[in-house]
Amino acid sequence: MSLFLDTARIEVKAGKGGDGAVAFRREKYVPDGGPAGGDGGKGGSVIFKVDEGMSTLMDFRYNRIFRGKPGEKGMNKGMHGRGAEDLIVHVPQGTTVKDNETGDVLVDLIEKDQEFVVAKGGRGGRGNIRFATPRNPAPEVAENGEPGEDKILLLELRVLADVGLVGFPSVGKSTLLSVVSNARPKIGAYHFTTITPNIGMVQVGYGDSFVMADMPGLIEGAHSGAGLGIQFLRHIERTRVLLHILDMSELEGRDPYEDYKTINDELESYNLRLMERPQLIVANKMDMPEAAERLAEFKEKLAADLEADQEMPEIFEVSGLIKTGLQGLLARTSELLAQTPEFLLYDEDALGDEVAYYGFEDEEKPFKVSRDDDGGWRLSGEKIEKLFIMTNFDHDESVMKFARQMRAFGVDETLRSMGAKDGDYVRIQKFEFEFVD
């Protein structure tokens, strides 16, 4: 089983805030002690942090749920509960975090030690010391802690490389990477020897270096899933220069020009501006007897197919096996990197409109009303459900406060207008009460 994993679906659940306390100060010589219930502590958030030592999402294969700790409950004498420590989850550099339901990109973690809160911990509930008023100096009211955020996330890893090697299987990409860098990829005389991206550091002269990535071989239909498909096409997205490796020998019986067109069609079909990147054609295996003749045929076909305003692409003749022609290729690659800015990983359509429009909008109604199969009424909605969860039903004053808040929301009026009658059951989550007209 491969130890390389570049996608993972996980659940993150931030910690619940601590419950506020209902307490009263009872001490000698303090006749008017009053309320003394402290607030609950904040729940622990779940935070992703870039770890340069990680190179795969393998840690998420079996560990798929990450829970933050709850905050401590409030205490007597006005003492607040301790906030929970945040849960730090380490991820590889180059991890993109998406909302699994909407597909929206939440963050692209590419900087060293970069952190991002993926699930925020819940606020601590207020103790009864917060609810004291001149009319009610000793309230028996406190809040439960706010639930922490709960999300399903999709993680996608894209390797951080400056240069990407693309081409059909067995054209010599891994061999080329092994002789120009410190990488030691698996090399074999069969297709798909490379099944995971290999990365190597290439030194060009003094102090000049770049990262090169050898991608698993592409085949026709890769953009729609053929072969290893888009599983590894995503890793090309962060590169700034592409080296298109072509096999000029007759060993595989392939037509270099058809291979060239097919691979470029796949890159274009993937639709991530890959064809906008500078691309150098690398005519590999030029040590073979028939290579020069096949290269001449390739150049003829390429020239005949160019548009009138198109320039002939740069072609470098190399042999990864006997290490010829490599210095010129690496020097030109380094020049292109110096001239080419980074490409945005996501286009405007993927990230949405960047222009913000401000204006008045109708406030979202705090609740919705529906009917259950047995004829009962069900209240739902983020605001009213959050209010319900944070209400401490162990104290009558808290229950009365909840009833007042529901009336302020317009729940009674809405139920009445929809035909609710005395004695009808009204439900919020698993709680049930009777409607009183």
Curated annotation (Swiss-Prot):
Its cofactor is Mg(2+). It is found in: Cytoplasm. The keyword Cytoplasm applies. One of its GO terms (cellular component) is cytoplasm. PROSITE patterns: G_OBG, GTP1_OBG, OBG, OCT. Its EC number is 3.6.5.-. Residues 161-338 form the OBG-type G domain. GO terms for biological process: ribosome biogenesis. Its main location: cytoplasm. Residues 2-160 form the Obg domain. Monomer. This is GTPase Obg. The gene is obg.
